[in-house]
A protein has these predicted regions:
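Short beta-strand/loop element within the Bergerat-fold HATPase_c
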Residues: 80-92
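Short conserved segment of the HATPase_c
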Residues: 105-117
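Conserved catalytic submotifs in the C-terminal HATPase_c
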Residues: 22, 44-54, 60
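Short alpha-helical Gxxx[C/S/T] motif in the catalytic ATP-binding
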Residues: 133, 137
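Glycine-rich ATP-lid/hinge loop adjacent to the conserved G-boxes
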Residues: 118-128
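Conserved glycine-rich
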Residues: 145-146
Length: 197
């Protein structure tokens, strides 16, 4: 079942070949993840930006982590609410995020949701699950030398941002550094409600 698969994946994370970084077109990956996200639920989907850069990442594992964040956003938000995702480069780091208008997480519970098999009280009431989703995301991001940032307000929604350093990645050419809709789209500096209309 799902629990066994999740535990196997976490066990594999200790292996040296857990990730296989390849030169990846981040804009293309962002658009592909966005397209796959559309099938996960009836929401107002919004692609905020796609970073026109290349990075040495494992696109399969990053897709897995990103879609886990999207699945969580769908699970903990209502039908037709907005779920947004995007990517950007800031200060030598690749940012890939998912934001929602869901139930949100109290500040004191953010560290709880980072623990394996743990979910907030509100999340437990809304749905079942293994409580391993964020552990898997954090494991994948950590294998890339990065971290998972969480910004949330109860009743307003959350923004989960995978932040990965680019120093080991190829430097984009000057023609690739421009981004589509990238200005002001990076969520780590915004509250979860910043994109609401």
């Amino acid at each position: 079942g799902v629990l066994i698969d999740d535990l196997i994946l976490l066990a594999k994370s200790a292996q040296s070949d857990f990730i296989t970084p390849v030169d990846t077109d981040v804009a293309e990956l962002t658009e592909m993840v966005f397209d796959k996200s559309l099938a996960l639920g009836e929401r107002r989907w919004q692609l905020e930006s796609a970073a026109f850069t290349r990075a040495m990442i494992d696109p399969t594992r990053i897709t897995q982590a990103w879609l886990q964040l999207v699945a969580n956003a769908v699970k903990y938000s209502s039908h037709y609410s907005t779920v947004r995702l995007g990517s950007a480069v800031r200060d030598g780091r690749l940012l890939m995020w998912v934001g929602d208008e869901g139930i949100g997480i109290a500040a004191e519970e953010i560290e709880v949701v980072r623990q394996r098999f743990k979910r907030t009280a509100g999340a437990q009431e809304m749905s079942s699950g293994t409580g391993l989703g964020l552990s898997i995301v954090e494991t994948i991001v950590a294998a890339h030398g990065g971290r998972l940032d969480i910004r949330s307000e109860v009743g307003e929604g959350s923004v989960f941002t995978m932040t990965i350093p680019l120093e080991a990645s190829p430097v984009p050419s000057s023609s690739e550094t421009a981004t589509s809709g990238d200005v002001g789209a990076s969520p780590p500096e915004q509250s979860p409600t910043a994109s609401k209309e």
